[in-house]
Swiss-Prot record:
Subcellular locations according to the entry: Cytoplasm
Catalysed reactions listed for this entry: N-terminal L-glutamyl-[protein] + L-leucyl-tRNA(Leu) = N-terminal L-leucyl-L-glutamyl-[protein] + tRNA(Leu) + H(+); N-terminal L-aspartyl-[protein] + L-leucyl-tRNA(Leu) = N-terminal L-leucyl-L-aspartyl-[protein] + tRNA(Leu) + H(+)
Keyword Ribonucleoprotein: no
PANTHER family assigned: ARGININE-TRNA-PROTEIN TRANSFERASE 1 (PTHR21367), ARGINYL-TRNA--PROTEIN TRANSFERASE 1 (PTHR21367:SF1)
Annotated source species: Dinoroseobacter shibae (strain DSM 16493 / NCIMB 14021 / DFL 12)
Protein's recorded name: Aspartate/glutamate leucyltransferase
GO biological process: ubiquitin-dependent protein catabolic process via the N-end rule pathway
Family per similarity comment: Belongs to the R-transferase family. Bpt subfamily.
Molecular function as annotated in GO: arginyl-tRNA--protein transferase activity; leucyl-tRNA--protein transferase activity
Paired cysteines (S-S): none
Function statement: Functions in the N-end rule pathway of protein degradation where it conjugates Leu from its aminoacyl-tRNA to the N-termini of proteins containing an N-terminal aspartate or glutamate.
Xref: InterPro entries: Acyl_CoA_acyltransferase, Asp_Glu_LeuTrfase, N-end_Aminoacyl_Trfase, N-end_Aminoacyl_Trfase_C, N-end_Aminoacyl_Trfase_N
Enzyme class per UniProt: transferase
EC id: 2.3.2.29
Length: 285
C-alpha cells in the first residue's frame, strides 16, 4: 500500500508481522526511501520526528493498535553520569576508540556473529551472512562512521588475547543536531565492561566535543527487558504525541494497546514535516 503527499518523498507501510519487543503483538512500519542528493537533509529532518535509518530506508513504527515504541534521545546538556555509569567509564578508561569510514571488515563480522549468537540467537538478524552485514554497514547515502573500540595490550584481561582486540563497534550517523547510533554490538565475553552502556556514554562525549546537542538511541519500549537500559541515562527524551519530551518516570509510560490513539496512515503521513530544501519540481510531484 502506498500513501503520498503533495510533497515528495513518498511513504509506504509494511505488512503486519510479529513484534520483536512485545510477545503476542504485531508490528507495522511507515517508511520511505533515502536516496539522492537530498538524502542527508531528509535524514536530518525525519530523525527529529522519530524515524530511524536502516541502509537506504527511513522508518518509524506505525502499528495498528499499539503506540508502545517511543524514539529516544539523550539531551547532552542535561546528561550527568550516574555512579554506576562513572564506574563503567573508569573500567573502560583504557579502551581505544577509532572512527573510520563505513567499510565492513572480517573482524567486525566475526564480532557481530559472536554477539548475535550470545545475545540474539533467535532475532531477525540471526541468519545474516557477511554480504548482508556488509550491506548494513556500507549502504549509507548519508554521513556515517563506524566507531570501533579496542582494548589496549595492557588492558587485556587474558594474556592469550591478541593486543588491540576488537571489543565493540557502532555504526553511527552524523546528523545536523546530533549522533544517531544506528546499530552497535560488542564482545559478549566482556560482561564486566558493560560495553553497551559504555558506547552510549562515549557517544555522549563525542557529541559534546563536537558541539552536537543530542545522541539518538533508537526506540525505547516501556517494560521491555531489551530496552530498559536506555531509561537509565539522565537527560533522556522520548518522541511522544508528535513532540520530544523528558521521559520523566519510566514507570508512568504504558505499553497497553491504544487503538483509538493511532491515527490512520494518511493522517500520519500528512503530519510529517518535510525539509524546505527539496527542489521545487520534486515538491510539486
Amino acid at each position: 500500500m502506498r500513501h503520498t503527499l503533495p510533497l515528495a518523498p513518498q511513504f509506504y507501510v509494511t505488512a503486519p508481522q510479529p513484534c520483536p519487543y512485545i510477545d503476542g503483538r504485531m508490528e507495522r512500519k511507515l517508511f520511505t526511501a533515502l536516496q539522492g542528493e537530498f538524502a542527508e537533509t531528509l535524514n536530518d529532518s525525519l530523525s527529529k520526528q522519530g524515524f530511524r535509518r536502516s541502509q537506504n530506508v527511513l522508518y518509524r513504527p506505525s502499528c495498528a493498535d499499539c503506540t508502545a515504541c517511543l524514539s529516544a534521545r539523550i539531551d547532552v546538556s542535561a546528561f550527568t553520569p550516574s555512579r554506576s555509569q562513572r564506574r563503567t567509564l573508569k573500567r573502560n578508561a583504557v579502551m581505544e576508540r577509532e572512527a573510520t569510514s563505513p567499510w565492513a571488515t572480517e573482524d567486525q563480522y566475526s564480532l557481530f556473529r559472536k554477539y548475535l549468537d550470545a545475545r540474539h540467537a533467535e532475532g531477525g538478524m540471526a541468519d545474516m551472512d557477511i554480504f548482508e552485514f556488509a550491506a548494513m554497514i556500507e549502504e549509507t547515502p548519508v554521513r556515517s562512521r563506524v566507531v570501533e573500540y579496542r582494548q589496549s595490550a595492557e588492558a587485556a584481561p587474558n594474556r592469550k588475547r591478541a593486543p588491540r582486540n576488537l571489543a565493540g563497534v557502532c555504526l553511527t550517523d552524523v546528523l545536523d543536531d546530533g549522533l544517531s547510533m544506528v546499530y552497535s554490538f560488542y564482545d559478549p565475553d566482556l560482561v564486566r565492561q558493560s560495553l553497551g552502556t559504555f558506547m552510549v556514554l562515549d557517544h555522549v562525549e563525542i557529541a559534546r566535543e563536537a558541539g552536537l546537542p543530542y545522541v539518538y538511541l533508537g526506540y525505547w519500549v516501556p517494560g521491555s527487558p531489551k530496552m530498559g537500559y536506555k531509561a537509565s541515562f539522565s537527560g533522556l527524551e522520548i518522541y511522544k504525541n508528535g513532540e520530544w519530551q523528558p521521559i520523566g518516570d519510566p514507570e508512568s509510560h504504558s505499553r497497553d494497546t491504544h487503538p483509538l490513539n493511532v491515527d490512520p496512515i494518511a493522517e500520519q503521513v500528512a503530519k510529517i514535516n518535510l525539509p524546505d530544501t527539496l527542489p521545487t519540481d520534486r515538491r510539486k510531484g
